[in-house]
């Protein structure tokens, strides 16, 4: 949290219009939703742990946005933020999640057997498969707001829980502060570890305070099941492997995640969840499943096709560069994943990835032979 609450009380000496941020050059969801009226109504409110409206919006004020990417521009500081500041969060959620209304209910389905196919994506094109989500532990504030003691308590709880996993999930925790620069960089390059906190979104929201205190990575012995501790969320759970067997990646994801949830519940610390928002996370873009199922796929021809963007939109998929968000594609390899998080289930979201990527690989093969793909362009899903 950038400011203490005494500072927030002090700001109330000024009129709302004197404190209202200049958002004229901004392109993010928060800037679109925050009117002077909403600012006036919410600015003296705070959550039980003391998170304020100015804390919610600071990252979006400091980062006007990207000309092509619509960022969210706000964060939650605790579970109650979404309720206390709902006049701002509701329109942002509706805008970001395809019209998801304040009365809508989210659905969860972590039964991996409900996924159809997914074990036959062509490994000549699909280089790796990955599914991730975030989880927040009830009773603690979120990374933009938590204190050092709280963050360390989350780490301690997480280590105890993860160290009790057995079988294919047996593994070890590696705290960031005891890693050498080289070890850290190697893990980042292998896509196992989160980047150092250089992202302005992380910095402006206060998530990088005290770095690297109480941050770390836990992974199983095969490095196919990983948990990041105390980055943007309390926990980021990741299942990944080389090749195109998304079915196996999703099975491991569901089984491991449910084991972890069970252990936390038994310890009296369930994950934050409600039937409207699903799993409650720091960034509103991750509400719902928090799930991003993605593959690294080689699309040398399709990526140059004039309808590439339209095909992705119709399949409800999004593309990122090879190194993740805000990076370029190297050697025509794209990171393709589900665009939706809220209002549909985990199984449905991964199904869209499996079916969509399969179709795109078929299109790529046709284009290689110089054939047209016009008859393969899908309808809007």
Curated annotation (Swiss-Prot):
Please give the chief subcellular localization of this protein: cytoplasm
Task: Tell me one Pfam family matched here.
Answer: ATP-gua_PtransN
The reaction(s) catalysed by this protein are: creatine + ATP = N-phosphocreatine + ADP + H(+)
Superkingdom, taxonomy of origin: Eukaryota
CDD domains given in the database record: creatine_kinase_like
Q: Which organism is it from?
A: Canis lupus familiaris (Dog)
What is the protein's given name? Creatine kinase M-type
Q: Which residues carry this modification: Phosphoserine?
A: 164, 178, 199, 372
- What does the record give as the function of this protein? Reversibly catalyzes the transfer of phosphate between ATP and various phosphogens (e.g. creatine phosphate). Creatine kinase isoenzymes play a central role in energy transduction in tissues with large, fluctuating energy demands, such as skeletal muscle, heart, brain and spermatozoa.
What range(s) does the Phosphagen kinase N-terminal domain occupy?
11-98
Any single GO molecular-function term of the entry would be: ATP binding
Q: Which UniProt keywords apply?
A: ATP-binding, Cytoplasm, Kinase, Nucleotide-binding, Phosphoprotein, Transferase
- Subunit structure, per the record? Dimer of identical or non-identical chains, which can be either B (brain type) or M (muscle type). With MM being the major form in skeletal muscle and myocardium, MB existing in myocardium, and BB existing in many tissues, especially brain.
The family annotation for this protein states: Belongs to the ATP:guanido phosphotransferase family.
Where Phosphothreonine occurs, the residues are 166, 180, 313, 322
Which InterPro entries does the entry mention? ATP-guanido_PTrfase, ATP-guanido_PTrfase_AS, ATP-guanido_PTrfase_cat, ATP-guanido_PTrfase_N, ATP-guanido_PTrfase_N_sf, Gln_synth/guanido_kin_cat_dom
Name all Phosphagen kinase C-terminal domain ranges: 125-367
Positions bound to ATP:
128-132, 191, 236, 292, 320-325, 335
């Amino acid at each position: 949290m950038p400011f203490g609450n005494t500072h927030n009380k002090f700001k109330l000496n000024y009129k709302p219009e004197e404190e209202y941020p200049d958002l004229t050059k901004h392109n993010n969801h928060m800037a679109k939703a925050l009117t002077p009226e909403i600012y006036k109504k919410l600015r003296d409110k705070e959550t039980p742990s003391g998170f304020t409206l100015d804390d919610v919006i600071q990252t979006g004020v400091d980062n006007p946005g990207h000309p092509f990417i619509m960022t969210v521009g706000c964060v939650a500081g605790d579970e109650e933020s979404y309720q206390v500041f709902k006049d701002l969060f509701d329109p942002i959620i509706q805008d970001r999640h395809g019209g998801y209304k304040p009365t809508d209910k989210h659905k969860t389905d972590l039964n991996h057997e409900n996924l159809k196919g997914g074990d036959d994506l062509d490994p000549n094109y699909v280089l790796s498969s990955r599914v991730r989500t975030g989880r927040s532990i009830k009773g603690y504030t979120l990374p933009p707001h938590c204190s050092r003691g709280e963050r360390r308590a989350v780490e301690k709880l997480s280590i105890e829980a993860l160290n009790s996993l057995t079988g294919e999930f047996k593994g070890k925790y590696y705290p960031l502060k005891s890693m050498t620069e080289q070890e850290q960089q190697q893990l980042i390059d292998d896509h196992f570890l989160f980047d150092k906190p250089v992202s302005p979104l992380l910095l402006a929201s206060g998530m990088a305070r005290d770095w690297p205190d109480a941050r770390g990575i836990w992974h199983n012995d095969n490095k196919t099941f990983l948990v990041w501790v105390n980055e943007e969320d309390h926990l980021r759970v990741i299942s990944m492997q080389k090749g195109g067997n998304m079915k196996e990646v999703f099975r491991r994801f569901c089984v491991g995640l449910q084991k972890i949830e069970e252990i936390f519940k038994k310890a009296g610390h369930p994950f934050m969840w409600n039937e409207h928002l699903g799993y409650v996370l720091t960034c509103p873009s991750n509400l719902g499943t928090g799930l991003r199922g993605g593959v690294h796929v080689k699309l040398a021809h399709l990526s140059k096709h004039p309808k590439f963007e339209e095909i992705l939109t119709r399949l409800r998929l999004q593309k990122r560069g090879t190194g993740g968000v805000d990076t370029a594609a190297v050697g025509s390899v794209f990171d393709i994943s589900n665009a939706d998080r809220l209002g549909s289930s985990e199984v449905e979201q991964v199904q869209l990835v499996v079916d969509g990527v399969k179709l795109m690989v078929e299109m790529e093969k046709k284009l290689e032979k110089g054939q047209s793909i016009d008859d393969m362009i899908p309808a809007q899903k």
